[in-house]
């Protein structure tokens, strides 16, 4: 029996190790800024790049590549200039594929490494979003500050209620003292001049009352 052995056709085996697709740029890379840059830095970067790639510039009018680049710059600016859209975009950067879904021929791929998890934070973070002088604080520091504010608020409320109660009681004591003084004066006049004199004075005051005078007319 004859046994045919076909040679390996190595010429038809292509190695795609050098044909990896180019990784798309992030908005930060398009504007050439840091991930923790401030809103002002985003605006300044957009202004500078617009001067270079804006379609109204004569040198860019006949260059489709520069026009397409300006579209990328505008999209990056619209996303990063608004805090809410920027936070959503930063969250989307947490998960990114490290390579194409297609496994190149001749390249060993570990299924467990199909995706590269890249946390979107710096191990040594600087100021939050580039705000100068504002440092990041830990959760326990925030909790301590909130507890201190709560204690100060409770103390202020207790002091306010206590002061209000003391003031109200002081006013009541003054009114009571004035009433007692008037009552004592009336009793003293009654003892000094007698009841008949008190009645005559009361009738005299009533006769001088404007209400009684208008009624008499």
UniProtKB/Swiss-Prot annotation:
SMART domains: DnaJ. This is DnaJ-like protein 60. Its main location: membrane. It is found in: Membrane. Residues 95-119 are annotated as: Disordered. The chain crosses the membrane at residues 141-161. Gene3D superfamilies: DnaJ domain. GO terms for molecular function: unfolded protein binding. Highly expressed in testis and ejaculatory bulb. CDD domains: DnaJ. One of its GO terms (biological process) is response to heat. One of its GO terms (cellular component) is membrane. May play an important function during spermatogenesis and/or in the male genital tract. It comes from Drosophila melanogaster. It comes from the Eukaryota. Pfam families: DnaJ. It is a single-pass membrane protein. Residues 26-93 form the J domain. Keywords: Chaperone, Developmental protein, Differentiation, Membrane, Spermatogenesis, Transmembrane, Transmembrane helix.
């Amino acid at each position: 029996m004859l046994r045919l052995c076909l040679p390996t056709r190595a010429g038809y085996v292509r190695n795609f190790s050098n044909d990896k697709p180019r990784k798309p740029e992030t908005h930060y890379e398009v504007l050439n800024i840091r991930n923790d840059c401030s809103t002002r830095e985003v605006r300044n970067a957009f202004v500078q790049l617009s001067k270079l790639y804006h379609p109204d510039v004569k040198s860019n009018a006949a260059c489709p590549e520069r026009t397409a680049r300006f579209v990328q710059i505008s999209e990056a600016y619209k996303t990063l200039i608004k805090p809410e859209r920027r936070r959503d975009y930063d969250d989307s950067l947490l998960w990114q594929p490290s390579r194409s879904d297609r496994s190149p021929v001749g390249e060993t791929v570990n299924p467990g490494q199909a995706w590269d998890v890249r946390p979107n934070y710096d191990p040594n973070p600087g100021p939050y979003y580039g705000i100068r002088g504002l440092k990041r604080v830990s959760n326990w520091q925030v909790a301590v500050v909130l507890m201190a504010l709560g204690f100060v608020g409770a103390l202020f409320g207790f002091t306010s209620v206590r002061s209000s109660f003391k003031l109200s009681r002081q006013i009541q004591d003054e009114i009571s003292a004035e009433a007692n003084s008037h009552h004592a004066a009336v009793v003293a006049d009654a003892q000094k001049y007698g009841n008949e004199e008190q009645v005559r004075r009361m009738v005299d005051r009533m006769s001088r009352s404007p209400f009684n005078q208008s009624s008499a007319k």
